[in-house]
Regions:
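Short hydrophobic core segments
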Residues: 7-18, 145
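Active-site substrate-recognition segment that forms the wall
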Residues: 16-125
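A generic alpha-helix preference that emphasizes hydrophobic side chains
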Residues: 7-8, 34, 88, 117, ...
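C-terminal catalytic lobe of FAD-dependent flavoproteins
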Residues: 100-186
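A conserved short coil-to-beta-strand element within the FAD-binding core of flavoproteins
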Residues: 1-6
């Protein structure tokens, strides 16, 4: 059985812990907290009521039993009530003028990079990283998998050189030489 880095590829995909596991280069990644809020469907005339998700200054996902509002982007964690108020205020134009009844909330950290692009690519001869997908992980993580697999297998990458450079793990080195290390989140 090969050990780490001997004859087989290793992929580090450990959110913010990837920063400590990738020792060959400094990654500017960290946790940024966010909160989703579930509210009772607001009392809005049926002609004005949403029937589809809205994404903009936050997002609103209407449902029969609850609507979901989100999401905060907190460099340092906020009190839940502050986050709820932010989500309601950010989406007020879709919620009508009546009272809003919060039902519950869910808080979590998301790993992000200093430039908000995911970190995807080779960090040494046998190691790749996939991290900092932020709130777009359901789109960028499968893309990361295809990039890493194509590199491991020696295939043509499924992205332009510009896209590869924007996600490359070594992109922080030159920036840090100019400005120092940028701290991300908590």
């Amino acid at each position: 059985i090969p050990t780490q880095g001997q004859g087989r590829p290793d992929v580090i995909a450990s959110a913010s812990a990837s920063r400590d596991l990738v020792t060959s280069m400094p990654l500017e990644i960290g946790d940024v907290y966010g909160q989703l809020d579930w509210i009772a469907p607001p009392d809005i005339p049926s002609a004005d009521r949403l029937d589809t998700a809205i994404v903009g200054n936050g997002y609103v996902l209407p449902g029969a039993e609850h609507w979901v509002l989100g999401s905060t982007y907190e460099q340092t964690p906020w009190p839940p009530a502050t986050a709820t108020e932010h989500n309601i205020t950010s989406n007020q134009r879709f919620l009508g003028d009546g009272p809003i009844e919060p039902v519950r909330y869910q808080r979590a950290a998301r790993c992000v990079s200093s430039d908000r692009d995911p970190v995807i690519g080779k960090v040494d001869e046998h190691t790749w990283v996939s991290a900092a997908h932020g709130s777009m992980g359901s789109s960028s993580a499968p893309f990361a998998a295809s990039l890493i697999v194509s590199d491991v297998l020696g295939w043509i990458p499924p992205a332009s050189p510009r896209a590869l450079a924007s996600a490359a793990p070594d992109r922080f080195i030159e920036r840090q030489a100019r400005r120092g290390v940028k701290k991300i989140g908590v």
